């Protein structure tokens, strides 16, 4: 798979951007803050409907604009599809495939597939469980878009259930002693049923994915850090997952067991939103025990496994390397260069030439600069000219 055409309007620092891209390696070089990452962020957004840098869409819309637009034409084994996205910071986003308006942007999932390496990946190892859950859920959504809808529905039910636990806390505490308490408990029962049904599907999908990653991640890590302790992964849940066929029933049982604690605390304590992808080195958790180099190796291993898994499904995802070479030693750089050499399309950003491995063989190269205008600083792009000064 590769992106042939990219058209962006009012996305971050780009009032407009039109690019014709080719298979192979494309470089975007420019100083930090000039907007090169915004280009690959736009492509990544079409793949995941979210940014790897921010949690909400508002920062994606250029200051002073009402919305942002992204159009990306993906070519996959000779078949062309154009994904169109209208990003609205204060309303529901809209999406099209070619000329067909979609009911939900989620219907775009799978049209563009990317695997992105970035400095933010360190949070997969060092950060909170939410980052690791998102890692799993993004892969699941890319491979099985229907399950993205299940996860979205779960999040909605979870939000409603938490709102009930907080707003109706006095009634819930009184229980069946009065009509308000009985009504609140009946409503909570409804949310429990929905949460368990949807949550079981999310957990089962994650467990199936972890089973596939269980060999891929340690193998990738061993290739990067052969002298380190062996890597191992597992899935930790708030629910007994020993019998996958009865996860829904186990969720209901656990919700009943913890109901009083949930009422007291005003939050939902059971479900996949509390789970974690456990990353170990030897017998120790990687978080807190891995060195800086081991942390980078583990983060890269997670992305390598993701890339290989999507490739096994029959499609080479677009490989995005966003400002990562500057952070890596020679061995890890070489591993990524070998991966890049075998991918159908690779998009690389770097601040300066010195950050790039010498054995990269780009097909195209662009220089990203900025210009100050009455509406603020905007990004501009031009094909690289040998001998030019990229800092001008």
Curated annotation (Swiss-Prot):
GO terms for molecular function: ATP binding; single-stranded DNA binding. One of its GO terms (biological process) is DNA synthesis involved in DNA repair. Keywords: ATP-binding, Cytoplasm, DNA damage, DNA repair, DNA replication, DNA-binding, Nucleotide-binding, SOS response. It comes from the Bacteria. InterPro entries: DNA-binding_RecF, DNA-binding_RecF_CS, P-loop_NTPase, RecF/RecN/SMC_N, RecF_2. Gene3D superfamilies: P-loop containing nucleotide triphosphate hydrolases, RecF/RecN/SMC, N-terminal domain. It is found in: Cytoplasm. It holds the Pfam family SMC_N. ATP binds at residues 30-37. The keyword DNA-binding applies. Its main location: cytoplasm. GO terms for cellular component: cytoplasm. The RecF protein is involved in DNA metabolism; it is required for DNA replication and normal SOS inducibility. RecF binds preferentially to single-stranded, linear DNA. It also seems to bind ATP. Belongs to the RecF family. HAMAP family: RecF (MF_00365). This is DNA replication and repair protein RecF. The lineage of its organism: Bacteria, Bacillati, Actinomycetota, Actinomycetes, Mycobacteriales.
